[in-house]
Amino acid sequence: MNCHDGLLIFNVQRYSLHDGEGIRTVVFLKGCPLKCRWCCNPESQKANPELIYRRSRCIGRDACGLCAQNAPKGVIFFAEDQKAVVNFGCAGNDFSWCVCCPAQALAIEGREVPIGEILDTVEQDAAFYRHGKGGLTISGGEPLLQKNVVNLLKQAKERRINTSIETSGYADREHLLEAAKYLDEVFYDIKSLDDEKHYAYTGVHNKRILENLVSLCQSCPEKKITVRTPVIPGFNDSKEDLKKIETFLNELPIVKWEKLPYHTYGVGKYEMLGRKYSL
């Protein structure tokens, strides 16, 4: 995927303290080849803009009703409480009509943003970066799915901005190594050493991910790399599963290994996107 002069993003989170050193501005890129069953950012998965509906914001048919007047036929209905009901299966790919919603209950998730504009946003907090630790963290989705991420990182370094990335590792190896040239820190997910389980829970095999981590460590031995493992009940939470990951990582010069607890903070987003949470 490649936006010609920018990146497809779905969120920018400022003042983050958990995605790299110091105060970070986290830019979330859209599109991911994995479909993790526990994903807390389902709006990150599709590599194109999509419709999202926040029902709690809807002010109802009698007070508004503009969505039904502007949406394609069959997309909008109303419940007994007068709030809109969205038939996502009929929504198509053109969501321009949803700008009519005054409460922003209906919105487009994902927009292309020029690299310069992204970096200008990051530099709004430059005072924190210049006088202490902090900088830009690229997350997703899988940020390496977008080719322009290298240009973003390169231009960030030209502006003397500290850079980090959060990646699944499921990416083209050369693209990963090229991006690494402009990264101060890499957060790299290793979810399971069991390939059968990995495929069942994420939709992809783990061979590329494991090989890419080895290549990254060999090609960039000085790079600060933190491996993260989300510990998911029934998937990789057994002592045996975690020991396999630990044994694999012990052969590599990893800075540290973080085990992240399972949570359900993102479950509500699935309903907003017309999907079901699958874990």
Q: PLM features: what roles do these ranges have?
A:
Residues 97-102, 191-194, 224-225, 271-273:
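Short, basic/glycine-rich phosphate-binding loops at helix/coil junctions
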Residues 1-2, 6-8, 26-27, 75:
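N-terminal pre-core extensions flanking Radical SAM catalytic domains
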Residues 20, 28, 50-57, 96-126, ...:
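N-terminal-biased segments
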Residues 247, 255, 270-279:
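A structural motif corresponding to the C-terminal lobe/cap of the Radical SAM core domain
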Residues 53-55, 107, 199-205, 274-279:
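Short glycine-enriched, charge-decorated loop/helix-capping segments at active-site entrances
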Residues 37-44, 65-83, 94-111:
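Iron-sulfur cluster-binding cysteine motifs and their immediate structural context
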